[in-house]
Amino acid sequence: MSDCIFCKIANKEAKSNIVFEDEMIIAFRDIDPKAPEHILIIPKKHIESLMNLQSNDRELASHILLDVIPKLANDLKIKDTGFRVVVNTGEDGGQTVSHLHFHLLGGRSMTWPPG
């Protein structure tokens, strides 16, 4: 998607503070952090939202949840104190960029409800 900012970040056409990258995903610091550690994890391939994941995306989803998030939580030293993972989906869900992304937040106590 030529106008998708996250596609531009994934393709290194836009600047970001990358903390981790592999063949499937890129993870970078949020430009408007809501916690001391606020990382966005995005697939390199354009997927509009969680609702657009297909059965052939199982490996990608599993990789993010089982490999990438635990690795980042460990690297950021938030795995023992706790963290939150958020996926905003659709307008009412608070999704502001139409590219699937996972928020990893930590480094402070999280409250409920989130707002």
Model-flagged regions — what are they?
Residues M1-G115:
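HIT superfamily nucleotide-processing domains
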